[in-house]
């Protein structure tokens, strides 16, 4: 039975996935260190494949880096070599590719306790369970009714699972909002508890990740203004109470930054915990797909 299951998964990936070439180039940066983190590397990813871009989420599972794009694709890299990735088209319940912007605008992803990929979408706010081959493998996740009131382009920007499998979801909201809304799934998998985080200095949430082995989360927030450019903030977030903790870092010029939206935590073999961030280039020639790695101190 196990042999046939492995064979099926291999064959399905071969059918649905297509490898593309990706170029990786180191980006120079000045040393950056705080009490909590140290900047270790920044690389830029490019590809001639027109599907590559708009990477707005990030997850690391074993030795695989997984991301989703704004145009409805799943990208799967090897953590050892990001020079090639498999591209998978996300599909709807009928097995058709997601083509309309309202349907394909994915923002975040996480893994549930059964191994399914949970992918959040905005505009048509929803969270759908997917296989690694881009196929829906279950019913949509029941969400709090208040999610429907989130703006089209300010929906489920960040999601993550706690150690017991419950979801934490964060709404980006409107620019003028004074608070950030988040919801923690109940143990019954039906109810939700709403929490709020005070918005500080007009930063908006873009990503969320859980540190290995505990329910301590790291919240990624971004601020942009034409004159000052992009700034990032990383904060601890209690996954049980929803309260903001210490600020790990504030990054701005001269550090090379872009539209960072995805974040994932992972642990090296030596026990060191790393944070990896990825930026969404919006398929614009004025932006870049950057991957930044920081070490927790």
Question: Residue spans of the language-model regions?
Answer:
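Sec-dependent N-terminal signal peptides
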Residues: 4-12
